[in-house]
Amino acid sequence: MAPRKRGGRGISFIFCCFRNNDHPEITYRLRNDSNFALQTMEPALPMPPVEELDVMFSELVDELDLTDKHREAMFALPAEKKWQIYCSKKKDQEENKGATSWPEFYIDQLNSMAARKSLLALEKEEEEERSKTIESLKTALRTKPMRFVTRFIDLDGLSCILNFLKTMDYETSESRIHTSLIGCIKALMNNSQGRAHVLAHSESINVIAQSLSTENIKTKVAVLEILGAVCLVPGGHKKVLQAMLHYQKYASERTRFQTLINDLDKSTGRYRDEVSLKTAIMSFINAVLSQGAGVESLDFRLHLRYEFLMLGIQPVIDKLREHENSTLDRHLDFFEMLRNEDELEFAKRFELVHIDTKSATQMFELTRRRLTHSEAYPHFMSILHHCLQMPYKRSGNTVQYWLLLDRIIQQIVIQNDKGQDPDSTPLENFNIKNVVRMLVNENEVKQWKEQAEKMRKEHNELQQKLEKKERECDAKTQEKEEMMQTLNKMKEKLEKETTEHKQVKQQVADLTAQLHELNRRAVCAAVPGGPSPGAPGGPFPSSGLGSLLPPPPPPLLSGGALPPPPPPLPPGGPPPPPGPPPLGGVLPPPGAPVSLTLKKKNIPQPTNALKSFNWSKLPENKLDGTVWTEIDDTKVFKILDLEDLERTFSAYQRQQEFFVNNSKQKEADAIDDTLSSKLKVKELSVIDGRRAQNCNILLSRLKLSNDEIKRAILTMDEQEDLPKDMLEQLLKFVPEKSDIDLLEEHKHELDRMAKADRFLFEMSRINHYQQRLQSLYFKKKFAERVAEVKPKVEAIRSGSEEVFRSRALKQLLEVVLAFGNYMNKGQRGNAYGFKISSLNKIADTKSSIDKNITLLHYLITIVENKYPKVLNLSEELRDIPQAAKVNMTELDKEISTLRSGLKAVETELEYQKSQPPQPGDKFVSVVSQFITLASFSFSDVEDLLAEAKELFTKAVKHFGEEAGKIQPDEFFGIFDQFLQAVAEAKQENENMRKRKEEEERRARLEAQLKEQRERERKVRKAKESSEESGEFDDLVSALRSGEVFDKDLSKLKRNRKRISNQVTDSSRERPITKLNF
């Protein structure tokens, strides 16, 4: 369908209110009683300064509703001309002051007229007065400043006019009042804001269309001009078609546009020589056909035109030629020219010159010829067949059946790809696109399904092969990476041991040289003097020297004498063994308390009793070697605001509002680790039905033959055919001795065995099948298990280091200790330390001012103000949450499982080495390489675990706890729970501060927003569109003359000025005089 853009170009020129080019000239209307003339007057007042004049002139220009271009032209005028225009406008406003200068007056009059249903009782003078009032409103809407129109719209003046139009009786509808009311709407649409308001109103176009029912020719002409102009507005074409459907129901028409064709055909009475109405009707019909979807869609133009042709418009057009009116002929020519072009283009689809749409035979033959030898032909025959079966009785719903069929076919033709109808469809929710989608040919669907199924199978096969190769590649890559990591670690360890070996070798050489030197000196000293008097039994030259070596400890000499002290060792050597205890004394046992001198604390005493902090004091005999020996809480008292602390946690003070909002300390739930369970193999018989069924399910999931499974086990699955989860399931179906014995008895019936039985039989032929399967499963799971264990070990190690080294934690404990000593009395006070579990009891102490405030909230506030470095606590203890999840007992079990599994694989490797090799068996080569790497990796894990346990023991003792009685999840869980409580309390404090600030900010902004809304409202009302009044008149004038459909746009531009200046019928338009500056 060829696009037709003839009308579009005319619109862009005429209806310039929707475009930014070709604006009409500025018209300035002045009223002097009932005559309009250009008033050239000399200003009576002296001209003010230029700055003041520009401000006054700007206010005047704002009321004229001008575009930016014309505003610039106005401001470019000389100062004298500006002052002359300003004085002339102000004088005119002074002369027209009165009640009629306010929109409220006209709205009251409209409501009063609408309330009076009949004009029969009215005197002629009263009727004339009301007509003048409506005419005055029309004039005011055209000539008053912009603020008048804006005020009229804000007061819902349009609804008042529409309500009057809907409720007027017959006499009023035939009077001049009706014509003037339509003129008011037309005048309102000359204004940009008014036009937008009319188009946006839900009922405006429908109510305007209802006025076509009047016999008043001038009213009909005005209505048709408005509707035709609205067709040219973006989105207005469909509104007009909807309005005509509305009028069909309102006027009880048989079909749409029936009244228009009837009026067009009337030629008797007052319609005999009436050309203006016929011109307006043809102008409207051309606008309906050529605008909206008709600009692009040939089918839509044919659809609408056929509706007019079915109403008999063509004979009427032939009769209208008798009027010999140039303007009417112009519209008639456009209608026929457009029809001829469309019918010619439509005929080209069938390779014809013309199609007789009046001939049912020709249209049927063209349709039959087009569909013959196509897949649609059977459906065409079915349509004809069912049309023959359609009921044809004169009574009943026969016409409605054909009407439904007609409307369905119309929708098929004119609906676009999105299922949208450019016309107002009488079939609601009828989307052709969705219907066609459901009626796709079944054969094509079947073919597509078969092709899709075939491609799906091929895709699945290729996907399985790809996944198999990817698994193989990933396994090889992982083994290579693990091997490289292990080799690098072995290299580092070897270099380290080599360096240590050299150092030890050098130390041995140095010690040997010292030993020879001491022997030489001892021999030299023993020869002249003989045995020592204090050592009966002869000299022991080797007893003193032997103490230099670490293995044997130095024995006690007879008589309880002390042995000689060992000589000093060279730098860097190992430490000497401990000396013997003093004579007659014994070393104290390891657990005995060591006396520690503790100075008495000088703790300030509160003036009133305080609420107690329920902590657990650490005994003084357990302070040695802990963090509490490094803490001095007495200096904290110099920083704390003790009066505020006493006031907040007084034991007798009444409750009142405080600075922290209601919050509850949340207790962290204990974290339960999942216990590892050992693989249990069901002891079932081979012939058991359930066991055989489960085995068959497993084999169907594997999608491997018995030979492929056997090859994978012998080669240690070098092609990655057996996933880890499948290996775990295969371990459940290891043939037991009873199964093997039973299968051996029936081995001669191998071909007749069931699938599960044959699988178990063939697997039993593999030497050490179960041990091989377990080794393969351990090999595949080893890296995963090590990867699970290492983060747990690392969490314990890093968590222990963090709590031991954290300065923020140490400072926090110091502050908490000061709080407790100040708040507690008697046995609960005067503490030098407390158990770390007491940290999670801080929140149990409630404030006496507000029960929702806890000691923890207060502590955080003090820390933020006095000890800001403590806020880095969560950063210094970042690994604590992970360490709190580690259960040492379960971790030891996992390490033990790895150790025993590795030992079992080594045992099987030794057994397989002793067996004669079988073809395709790669167990020895693959497992030997695996054992080398796995052993080193496991030893590395064990070293890390030993280091982690040592650091954990050190951390536990650092806080005064007993290492053997507390586990990592319990120890680190205390800190984790405390960190969570601190974060929550800190957030609650922050939320309270934000809420308080928000309330203050909202209060400040409330007044500002109120002032701003008032200012915006004034600006919005004062803001005026960039279009000139009178543009809607230009559009109607162009429609009336037919120039909107003219191909020659230059002619339209040349005639525009002439049309706008032409004085038209005084009953429809008043003269307009332009000011050209």
From Swiss-Prot:
Biological role stated in the UniProt entry: Binds to disheveled (Dvl) and Rho, and mediates Wnt-induced Dvl-Rho complex formation. May play a role as a scaffolding protein to recruit Rho-GDP and Rho-GEF, thereby enhancing Rho-GTP formation. Can direct nucleation and elongation of new actin filaments. Involved in building functional cilia. Involved in the organization of the subapical actin network in multiciliated epithelial cells. Together with DAAM2, required for myocardial maturation and sarcomere assembly. During cell division, may regulate RHOA activation that signals spindle orientation and chromosomal segregation.
A cellular component annotation (GO) from this entry: motile cilium
Knockout-associated phenotype: Conditional knockout mice lacking Daam1 in myocardial cells show cardiomyopathy. Conditional knockout mice lacking Daam1 and Daam2 in myocardial cells show stronger cardiomyopathy.
FH1 domain residues: 528-599
Biological classification of the source: Eukaryota, Metazoa, Chordata, Craniata, Vertebrata
Domain GBD/FH3: 45-420
Biased composition (Pro residues): 530-539, 549-592
Domain comment as written in the entry: The C-terminal DAD domain may participate in intramolecular interactions with the N-terminus.
Coiled-coil blocks: 437-526
Subunit structure: Interacts with CIP4, FNBP1 and FNBP1L. Interacts with the SH3 domains of Abl, BTK, endophilin, spectrin and SRC. Binds specifically to GTP-bound CDC42 and RHOA. Interacts with INTU; INTU mediates the indirect interaction between DAAM1 and NPHP4. Interacts (via coiled coil domain) with KANK1 (via coiled coil domain).
Subcellular location: Cytoplasm; Cytoplasm, Cytoskeleton, Cilium basal body
Tissue expression profile of the protein: In early embryogenesis, expressed in embryonic and extraembryonic ectoderm. In later stages of gastrulation, expressed also in somites and ribs and posterior vertebrae of developing skeletal system. During organogenesis, expressed in CNS, PNS, stomach, liver and limb bud.
Biased composition (Basic and acidic residues): 1007-1026, 1066-1077
SUPFAM superfamilies named among the record's database cross-references: ARM repeat, Formin homology 2 domain (FH2 domain)
Similarity-based family: Belongs to the formin homology family.
BP-aspect Gene Ontology terms: presynaptic actin cytoskeleton organization; Wnt signaling pathway
Region Actin-binding: start-end pairs: 693-702
Residue ranges occupied by any FH2 domain in the UniProt entry: 600-1008
Name by which UniProt lists this protein: Disheveled-associated activator of morphogenesis 1
GO terms of molecular function: actin binding; identical protein binding; small GTPase binding
Gene that this sequence comes from: Daam1
UniProt keyword annotation of Lipoprotein present: no
UniProt modified residues of type Phosphoserine: 34, 1026, 1029
Region (Disordered) residue spans: 457-478, 526-596, 1007-1033, 1056-1077
Superkingdom: Eukaryota
